[in-house]
């Protein structure tokens, strides 16, 4: 695991209970995160980031999740959103990342609608775009949009400096579709002062992630606020922006299960062998895929599939192992004020994330 100094680790863990009580990361936890640059794990040094490789960043996220589930999850989701710096237009990225406390939050669900605004001549501002352009395959599409939407689960909302969100595109009152019938979706960036935060995060665990909803209504934004998460659309040259987003998301979430399960086992006893074997398989899969990405040859499909499978296996085994041990922990594990109870609640709340949730046999969910 990443070697976080013992005194720092003790301070972060010691503040976890108070962070849960107040419903968001403790100010002293945040101060450490900013000082260490953890929201910028995958941001280039030229933008003030740590510029870590994926395996290096994963080990930090794992260790933070071991110290405090809400802390690890928040750093993971926010550093994942800050990773979008590679796909933002440089003039926008420079302004955002001039703030040492830059922290992006957001949602991947297309729960907003961006209406193409027409100019006086009746044409979309910026010129008429083909369908492939709207989908981000061939540069600028329209020019200006009016966005309305509400998005759930924006981890780190209270301290976010900007928000990202996916929207369907509407033109002439019609929601556009791609040639295969799927909806045309674009990613947008909103500044903090442009959104309304709705404090509705009420769950049994991961309380201090403060994963509230946010909304915009009739917000006008230009084409420079749109971006596409695709290596072909990256503005920055680092290998991390060529690593496929699906595998990146799976791996970064999975290590949080590993960190929380490791801590749960530490609190229960020394039963580590099973989790250790799954951990080794996971990091081997990530390392293999990362090395291919760094070589610039593209990551083979089978290696990406191995990352996905190892991530799901890691999350599933973490859940199973914790649930096997829970009945042996006594009443202290059922008391909300104890660390072992908080770890259990955090892990089981995190396990509801759809990316790594087990498939339902009848396909109903």
Set out the residue ranges of the language-model regions.
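C-terminal helix-coil-helix/basic helical segment that borders enzyme active sites and/or dimer interfaces
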Residues: 13, 17-20, 277-313, 326-334
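Generic structural signal for well-ordered, non-transmembrane alpha-helical segments
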Residues: 259, 272-276, 308, 312-319, ...
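Glycine-rich cofactor-pocket loops
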Residues: 19-23, 237, 242, 248, ...
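Glycine-rich flavin
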Residues: 27-35, 40-159
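Active-site glycine-rich loop that binds ribose-phosphate moieties when present
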Residues: 105-108, 167, 189-203
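DPxDG-like acidic metal-binding loop motif
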Residues: 150-194, 330
